[in-house]
Amino acid sequence: MAPIALAPTTNTRFVTKLKTSIVSPQPNTLHDVLAHAVERYPLHELGFITSSAHDSSIQTKTFSEFNQYVRNLARAMLEWGKPKGSVVVVYLTEHEDNMAAVWACLLAGYVPCLQPALSAQQAHKEAHVAHIKNLFGSAIWLTSEIGAEQISSISGLDLHLLSELKASAEKFNVAANWVAYEAKPDDEAILFLTSGSTGFSKAVVHTHRTILAACRAKGQSYGLTSESRILNCKPHVDLTLAFN
């Protein structure tokens, strides 16, 4: 029997479209972004500028390596015993450390807040830290040994060292898709502090939805593809996660 050519029907087109959407859904949360990046481009790299090096050298990690690293950090964070949604003030100087801490907080169910360099004036520094504590109703800080020295004289802070968190994370080897909880698009994702030029700093809340909307709009406007290279600058009120 000769083969019969059939024109695609509406149902056929619908099924084809449905299959495509199931195979490659649009990310709805930042958790999805990381998972999709690892699944589709495992060998693509993130480059981190090392500010402490004299030549500002760039260290790289593949998406797969970074994914495993931050998920292990996130699992180690749970050992702190903090409730879901707790705000963690991230006070670090190195590019990679900041990004790893932010992603680990997200995956652990915490809300990261990047803290810019504190004032060298003790009175200003103490006032700002006290304000942040009152603003968030907590005082969880993730920092380095140098950062801890700057704020160790301020009472009532729950300080955690990144070096100790890294050591704790070495005990874990979680699954490549491990998360402490499933995020929703309108969950708080990250907090940004304003400069405080008109008084004490205010916290700007960004949800998973708002960050992804900004990323999609910028990506379309600039014509970005999976081969694009992005220099991720970090102004105090910009989206640190935008193209990480």
What role is predicted for each listed range?
Residues 55, 129-130, 139-186, 200:
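ANL superfamily adenylate-forming
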Residues 90, 222-244:
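Conserved AMP-binding loop of ANL adenylate-forming enzymes
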Residues 78, 103-114, 135, 238, ...:
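Short hydrophobic alpha-helices that are characteristic scaffold elements of the AMP-binding
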Residues 73, 91-96, 102, 114-116, ...:
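Conserved AMP-binding
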Residues 42-46, 170-193, 199-200, 205, ...:
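Conserved pre-ATP/AMP-binding loop-to-beta segment of ANL
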Residues 8-17, 33-62, 189-191:
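AMP-dependent adenylate-forming
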Residues 25, 44-82, 86-102, 120-127, ...:
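Conserved AMP-binding/adenylate-forming core of the ANL superfamily
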Residues 102, 118-152, 170-171, 214-231:
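Conserved ATP-dependent adenylate/AMP-binding module captured primarily in the ANL superfamily
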